[in-house]
Regions:
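Anionic group-transfer/hydrolysis microenvironments
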Residues: 7-9
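Active-site beta-strand-loop-beta-strand hairpin of nuclease catalytic cores
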Residues: 1-5
Length: 110
């Protein structure tokens, strides 16, 4: 009955910019926050990333190429589990409908 937010970051500049946001991932319905980043990005900037993510979790993604040259990501694993926020507000039925609608709008408008 809660949301889990996953922020996808593909480079260190995008990752750093996330911490300059005025409202840093503090929506009341979000119980856990994860960053999903390429494994090689993490290995290159491990100390900085570990220091900044605080209670957020970390999902590492490996970049793979298939036989046709198509690049895709494969989850390497949960490097760190997110600490649940104690003040998170459970979703109401209206909230669930709202988020489902938002998700559908993102696909329909492509």
């Amino acid at each position: 009955n809660y949301l889990t937010e996953v922020e996808i970051k593909i480079d260190i500049y995008d990752f750093r910019a996330d911490f300059k946001k005025e409202n840093y991932h503090n929506h009341p319905n979000v119980r856990q926050l994860y960053y999903a980043i390429p494994t090689d990005l993490y290995l290159k900037h491990k100390d900085e990333i570990d220091e900044r993510i605080d209670n957020a979790g970390l999902i590492l993604i490996d970049e793979l190429m298939d036989y046709n040259g198509i690049i895709y990501g494969k989850v390497n694993g949960f490097h760190k589990k997110a600490k649940p926020r104690k003040n998170a507000v459970p979703l109401t039925e209206d909230d669930k409908f709202h988020y489902l609608k938002l998700g559908c709008m993102k696909w329909v408008n492509r």
